[in-house]
């Protein structure tokens, strides 16, 4: 059975539910302290939270820890690397994904459910979705305003939308460029998402739309 590492930095707070979602998707998962080696794992997830209390910038200090060099090796080897919320911020700070995540257009913490339109189903994380499918996941961030100098080089996975899938300014909770909610690297094996799929992985939580992401990731890692 494939096994995923859920990396825990000081300030990480979404590791338990992320571990549970991966297990529910059919893989082994283990919470790994950031000073631990990743050599025995098939994929890695950087979960949400406030690593190092978001000092300097969200994700900036975590991105400079030694374990990130191993994460970069995973990415180079084509293994799945997923960053959720703060994990997405870490991936951009580490240069594993293009662009940056800036403070929300309205400068406050936003915590609510959003609708997303699936823009790319050709990544290891989105292969179980339908093109243009509208899904629901929660967001919880103060710095989720995605920006890139050259949007044409950004591989968009999810976009904020209304419940019909229309990409509108009103549906954009944070001012993110092109309503971007999640992006992948050029090869597709690194994904960063501001919405929390682990919080949408159980019908009792209001949605199982995020579970598809984990099942897609697990199925791809088995190949």
Swiss-Prot record:
Documented EC number(s): 6.3.5.3, 3.5.1.2
Associated pathway: Purine metabolism; IMP biosynthesis via de novo pathway; 5-amino-1-(5-phospho-D-ribosyl)imidazole from N(2)-formyl-N(1)-(5-phospho-D-ribosyl)glycinamide: step 1/2
Domain Glutamine amidotransferase type-1: 4-223
InterPro entries named among the record's database cross-references: Class_I_gatase-like, PRibForGlyAmidine_synth_PurQ
GO BP term, pick one: 'de novo' IMP biosynthetic process
Active-site residues, as the UniProt record annotates them: 85, 196, 198
Molecular function GO terms recorded: ATP binding; glutaminase activity; phosphoribosylformylglycinamidine synthase activity
GO cellular component terms, A-Z: cytoplasm
Keyword entries, A-Z: ATP-binding, Cytoplasm, Glutamine amidotransferase, Hydrolase, Ligase, Nucleotide-binding, Purine biosynthesis
Subunit structure: Part of the FGAM synthase complex composed of 1 PurL, 1 PurQ and 2 PurS subunits.
Entry-linked NCBIfam families: FGAM_synth_I, PRK03619.1
PANTHER family listed in its UniProt record: PHOSPHORIBOSYLFORMYLGLYCINAMIDINE SYNTHASE SUBUNIT PURQ
Name of the protein in question: Phosphoribosylformylglycinamidine synthase subunit PurQ
Name of the gene this protein is made from: purQ
């Amino acid at each position: 059975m494939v096994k995923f590492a859920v990396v825990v930095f000081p300030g990480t707070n979404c590791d338990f539910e992320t571990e549970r979602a991966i297990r529910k998707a059919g893989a082994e998962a283990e919470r790994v302290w950031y000073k631990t080696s990743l050599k025995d794992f098939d994929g890695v997830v950087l979960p949400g939270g406030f690593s190092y209390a978001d000092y300097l910038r969200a994700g900036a200090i975590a991105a400079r820890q030694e374990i990130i060099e191993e994460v970069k090796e995973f990415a180079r080897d084509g293994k799945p690397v997923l960053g959720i919320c703060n994990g997405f911020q870490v991936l951009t700070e580490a240069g594993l994904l293009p662009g940056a995540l800036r403070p929300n257009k309205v400068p406050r913490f936003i915590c609510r459910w959003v609708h997303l339109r699936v823009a790319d189903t050709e990544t290891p994380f989105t292969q179980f979705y339908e093109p243009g499918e509208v899904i629901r996941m929660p967001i919880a961030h103060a710095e989720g305003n995605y920006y890139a100098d050259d949007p044409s080089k950004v591989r968009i996975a999810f976009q904020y939308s209304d419940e019909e899938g229309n990409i509108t300014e009103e549906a954009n909770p944070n001012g993110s460029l092109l309503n971007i909610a999640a992006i992948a690297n050029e090869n597709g094996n690194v994904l960063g998402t501001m919405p929390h799929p682990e919080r949408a992985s159980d019908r009792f939580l209001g949605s199982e739309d995020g579970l598809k992401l984990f099942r897609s990731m697990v199925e791809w890692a088995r190949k």
